[in-house]
């Protein structure tokens, strides 16, 4: 479920955005989905794969469960996910999880753009920094709100 979407000045066309709402989304080929999968228990990920499979959207889509589990491990280690034209050819994305203090995943955020702009290591590093910073800010806001609930006598 998308809670919020925004388009930048150089956003990909509205036809692409509308088409995303007309078809099922699978977690294994999007940056947001992979960021979520990486932080779910392995049994839950296996259930999702058994239930929905690894649908191939492009030649770059991961369709092998072992390859997906390897990538999910890498995502946990590095703290972000990358969609390398796995959902739509010509579009790449970088995502980051939003976690509770105990490490449970609440959701994720991502930024996407044309592959020709997002292929350079410098640009990917810039996007990783932006998205992980955004995820961290959201986590702090959520965790601060939770802490306020634990101490109702204090007002912020």
Task: Locate predicted features.
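Sensor-regulatory modules in signal-transduction proteins
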Residues: 98-101
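Conserved GNAT-family N-acetyltransferase fold
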Residues: 4, 96, 109
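Glycine-rich acetyl-CoA-binding "A-motif" of GNAT/NAT acetyltransferases
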Residues: 105
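Juxtadomain coupling helices with adjacent low-complexity linkers
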Residues: 108-156
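Amphipathic alpha-helical effector-binding/dimerization core
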Residues: 1-50
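Amphipathic alpha-helical segments that line or abut small-molecule/effector binding pockets
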Residues: 31-39, 69, 129, 133
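Short, basic/aromatic recognition patches
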Residues: 49-95, 133, 140-141
């Amino acid at each position: 479920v998308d809670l919020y979407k925004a388009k930048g000045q150089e956003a990909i066309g509205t036809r692409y955005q509308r088409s995303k709402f007309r078809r099922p989304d699978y977690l294994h080929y999007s940056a947001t989905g992979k960021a979520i999968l990486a932080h779910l228990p392995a049994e839950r990920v296996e259930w999702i794969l058994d239930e929905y499979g690894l649908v191939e959207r492009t030649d770059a889509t991961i369709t092998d469960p072992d390859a997906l589990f390897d990538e999910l491990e890498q995502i946990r280690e590095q703290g972000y996910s990358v969609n390398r034209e796995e959902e739509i050819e010509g579009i790449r994305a970088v995502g980051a999880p939003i976690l509770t203090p105990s490490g449970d995943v609440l959701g994720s955020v991502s930024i996407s753009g044309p592959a020709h702009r997002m292929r350079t290591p410098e640009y990917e590093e810039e996007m990783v920094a932006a998205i992980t910073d955004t995820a961290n800010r959201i986590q702090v806001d959520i965790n601060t709100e939770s802490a306020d609930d634990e101490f109702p006598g204090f007002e912020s």
